[in-house]
Amino acid sequence: RVYPYGSTAGQILGLVDVDGNGQTGLELYYDDILKGEAGKLVLQQGAYGMPIPGGTEVDEPAKDGQDIILSIDIDMQQYVEERLKQGVSDIGGEDGSAVLYDADTGDIIAIASTPYLDPSDRSNIEEGATSVKAITTQFEPGSIFKTASFCAMLEAGGITAQTTVDCPVYIEADEYKISDAHERAATTMTAAEVLAQSSNVGTSLLVQQHLGFSGLYDKIRKYGLNDATGVDYPGEAEGYLTNVSTWSLIQSYNVTFGQGISLSPLMITRFYGAIANGTGVAHTPHFLIAKPSSGEEVTWDSEQIIENTDAIAPLTEMLEGVVENGTGKMAAVEGYTTAGKTGTAEYADDSGSYVKNMYNLDFVGFLPNATSNLVCFVGVNHVPYERNTCEVFKDIMTEASSRYKIAQK
């Protein structure tokens, strides 16, 4: 194999062994069509190993492997990798992931997780570098998951953006206290303000009062936030969520704001895609877009995950409010309306216990009313203080907007 781009997209492409067999990445996933078939020559021999004229003979020529065309834009991929690596360093995290996804088609334009892999140099492969962790690893999403809670409530007709909720300083559940990330006095908020200010208390109470936890659980399943996406990449993670019948009150509250549930960055990106494209349809994320050698058509599944599409416009407007007036101000892309959600989740160690003053940070968003419906996720893990990944998102979307000549409608 020759890798002209070095480490760029190295995790996506993956590794082969000395015999050319795929070991990781797309080399493994598409091994059967990439490696081709060896030829065979069998001759009947006589004395001294000489072929017998007219004897049994098998002559099967070798078959070349097929070419495949991927959705990855290598220049955009390089930019995303460089910006993500810098962002992880600036924020002080242990590792990070980024996804740039076309919500209209399911094409993965760029995807990366630090540390990176250079398939052409195996002398120093870092731990965790051989797979795209945005696909293969679960994490607790934190407040970016609140969008799913609000989508479910809007779909059910339980709330509007102006529905109010009384928010005490904290609420109690099973001897625990739930409060917001930032100190505030008891107040009354609209649903739009709850999302913009990322209130854990407000989100919990709105779901409890206007949807119910069983209703939320059903929608989580419908949105595909507990299942693998079906992406063409080996080792995709599935989500983790226990059945609602086992939920305690504290777990019920926690799920509404993205704790006590695990999923992959690609799973949440797919969900946001169904909002960004305005149709409620989620397209299977994928890399393969063409098989030119065979001419075989490549198709991918789509699913109507948001059934009441009347919920999409008000939800999008509320996500715009997050960037205009709330926790996501630093994500605003100049010249465009920007919608999205910040997330800060407490970091859980290998035992499942939360580590004090250690966080996973993320942002996922899109550009409403633009000529291209790209969704971008950026997450940084194991950060020793509360910050955000908004600026990395902003820079990636700014680069994409310029590169693809995206215009505001």
Sequence positions of predicted segments:
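A short acidic/glycine-rich loop-to-helix N-cap element
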Residues: 381-392
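Small/polar-residue-rich segments within soluble enzyme cores
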Residues: 1-65, 269, 393-398
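Flexible, solvent-exposed loop/hinge segments and secondary-structure transition points
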Residues: 20, 85-96, 100-105, 113, ...
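Beta-lactam-recognizing serine transpeptidase/beta-lactamase-like catalytic domain environment
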Residues: 47-57, 103-142, 148-378
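Conserved, well-ordered alpha-helix/loop/beta-strand core segments that scaffold catalytic motifs
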Residues: 52-96
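Structural motif corresponding to the C-terminal cap of alpha-helices
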Residues: 83-91, 116, 323, 404
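Amphipathic, well-packed alpha-helical segments that form the structural scaffold of globular domains
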Residues: 31, 35-38, 81, 85, ...
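Short, gly/Ser/Thr-rich active-site loops of penicillin-recognizing serine hydrolases
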Residues: 296-299, 391-409
